[in-house]
Every structure is written in structure tokens, then in C-alpha cells.
């Protein structure tokens, strides 16, 4: 095998296959739908971010720690981050009884067969959101909110 052939074969393993992407997209759709049902008007938006949204996520066969990051934007975050992490964990345990669900600050992890999903509670930064629409509070250390 020459170097060019090896590199082509290797690089093809670094890209999600269509069926893997389809499984992930379906899971994202179901998670979003279930979040809307479970929380109703308590949440403002559900956003996929990170490597999957940038189309740089690696297949799990290459990177066992590959995950899909999902930000759950709550309408009002008047409590501490742990309050919202607990709510997301309760959601995950309710809908994903046969999956591994755990908290891993600042997220709640749902381990499905094909990939891990990390749910991050958040809320818009009040007072700035009219100027910077993509500014959010997310959990930080010491159970405090961080601006991003």
C-alpha cells in the first residue's frame, strides 16, 4: 500500500458515515422533542453546538469520547446551576431508562449505543441579550453561572 492510498483510507475513517449521521440526527430530533414535551414553556430553545454543529465530530470508533453537545436554554434561570442539572437529569432518567445517565459538570450525559449526548442547562444573559443574542449563562465551578 502506498502512502497516498493509506492516507485516503485513514482519512475516510475520520468522517461520520451517512448511517451514523442519520442515527445522530434522529436522536437529536427525539431529544429536542422530548425536552419540549417534558419542560413545555420552561424552555426557550434547544441548540446543538460544538463539534457536531461544526461538522468536526469524530466517529466513536476513532474517538470514544465523541459527544453531541446540546444546550437547553431555560426561560428563567433564577436558581443555581445544580437545580437545572437536576431537572435535566430527571428528564434523562425518565426518557432514557435503559441508557447510562450521569452528571458530569457542567452537563448531564446520556450514553446511547451510538454516541453520548451532553445536555447543558443555560439561559440568556439578561441585559445583554438585545446586543449579543448568543450570550448565555452556563454552569461553572462552585455552582455559579458563567457568561459565555
Region roles according to the model:
Residues 72-76:
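Short beta-strand-to-loop capping motifs
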Residues 32-35, 85-135:
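Conserved catalytic core of two-metal-ion nucleotidyltransferases
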Residues 1-65, 77-84, 108:
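N-terminal regions immediately upstream of nucleotidyltransferase
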Residues 69:
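Acidic Asp/Glu-based divalent-cation binding sites
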Residues 130-148:
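Aromatic/basic-lined ligand-recognition segments
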Amino acid at each position: 500500500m502506498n502512502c497516498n492510498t493509506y492516507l485516503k483510507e485513514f482519512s475516510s475513517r475520520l468522517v461520520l458515515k451517512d448511517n451514523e449521521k442519520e442515527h445522530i440526527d434522529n436522536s437529536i430530533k427525539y431529544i429536542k422533542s422530548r425536552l419540549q414535551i417534558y419542560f413545555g414553556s420552561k424552555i426557550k430553545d434547544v441548540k446543538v453546538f460544538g463539534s457536531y454543529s461544526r461538522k468536526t465530530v469524530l466517529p466513536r470508533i476513532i474517538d470514544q469520547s465523541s459527544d453531541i453537545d446540546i444546550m437547553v436554554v431555560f426561560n428563567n434561570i433564577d436558581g443555581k446551576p445544580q437545580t437545572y442539572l437536576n431537572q435535566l437529569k430527571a428528564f434523562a432518567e425518565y426518557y432514557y431508562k435503559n441508557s447510562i445517565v450521569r452528571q458530569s459538570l457542567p452537563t448531564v450525559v446520556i450514553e446511547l449505543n451510538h454516541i453520548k449526548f451532553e445536555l447543558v442547562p443555560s439561559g440568556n444573559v439578561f441585559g445583554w441579550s438585545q446586543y449579543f443574542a448568543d450570550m448565555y449563562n452556563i454552569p461553572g465551578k462552585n455552582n455559579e453561572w458563567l457568561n459565555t
